[in-house]
């Protein structure tokens, strides 16, 4: 498998419960390296631009409000098959469907407050990483 990079966001429900370290440990235990990371507080407008792909979905406004409600941790993960590996470590979007030991099974509070976001494809990862990080900030 090729070395890839993917974007991960530790969402407000997890940052407000001080779960960043526990979530990062799960990424690292799975063989993913954190090559860039920062804690930021998104505005609703910034969240709206990031999640623009969902603009026509009924949950869009609630998602943007939630993502702007508390700080988030944005990070770039790197490793072999990083996109698929990250999605495996995160678990299913609905925590009730997430496999035991995954981030969402252990930490998510609901489908909407599911603790983490991860890119779903190489093209998406490139766009999402560029939204939050300059090339100088990627120090893999």
From Swiss-Prot:
EC code: 2.7.4.6
Gene3D superfamilies assigned to the protein according to its UniProt record, in alphabetical order: Nucleoside diphosphate kinase-like domain
Alphabetized UniProt keyword annotations: ATP-binding, Cytoplasm, Kinase, Magnesium, Metal-binding, Nucleotide metabolism, Nucleotide-binding, Phosphoprotein, Transferase
One matching Pfam family: NDK
CDD domains in the record: NDPk_I (cd04413)
Cofactor: Mg(2+)
Function: Major role in the synthesis of nucleoside triphosphates other than ATP. The ATP gamma phosphate is transferred to the NDP beta phosphate via a ping-pong mechanism, using a phosphorylated active-site intermediate.
Self-association state and partner proteins as the record states: Homotetramer.
Name of the molecule in the record: Nucleoside diphosphate kinase
Species per Swiss-Prot/TrEMBL record: Dinoroseobacter shibae (strain DSM 16493 / NCIMB 14021 / DFL 12)
